[in-house]
UniProtKB/Swiss-Prot annotation:
NCBIfam families: fliE. Transmembrane segments: none annotated. The keyword Ribonucleoprotein does not apply. This is Flagellar hook-basal body complex protein FliE. It comes from Helicobacter acinonychis (strain Sheeba). It comes from the Bacteria. One of its GO terms (cellular component) is bacterial-type flagellum basal body. Belongs to the FliE family.
Length: 109
């Protein structure tokens, strides 16, 4: 009986596919780049900072509306809507992250 692991003819079609795929990725420039640790934390901090800025703009627009100092009601409504949408998005991202974390905790090793 012939040993399968010594038969290179079985592996040749797969090795050709692998090299073709590698050259296509290199030609198209879609290779994966290594990212430094902490990129996610920087992105998260930046997103939270932007959310905070939109919330502050919304609060200022609401305060201006309450005191009658608003000049453009349309811009105030846009700022409030933008802050509301940003907060909903951030809450959904948080919920998905918590869900993924809980799923990892349930994973058996």
């Amino acid at each position: 009986m012939q040993a399968i692991h010594n038969d290179k003819s079985l592996l040749s079609p797969f090795s050709e596919l692998n090299t073709d795929n590698r050259t296509q990725r290199e030609e198209s420039g879609s290779t994966f780049k290594e990212q430094k640790g902490g990129e996610f934390s920087k992105l998260l901090k930046q997103s939270i900072s932007e959310l905070n800025n939109t919330q502050e703009q919304s609060d200022k627009a609401l305060a201006d509306m309450a005191t009658g100092q608003i000049k453009d009601l349309h811009q105030a409504a846009i700022a409030i809507g933008k802050a509301e949408t940003s907060m909903k998005l951030m809450l959904e991202v948080r919920n998905k992250a918590i869900s993924a974390y809980k799923e990892l905790l349930r994973t058996q090793i």
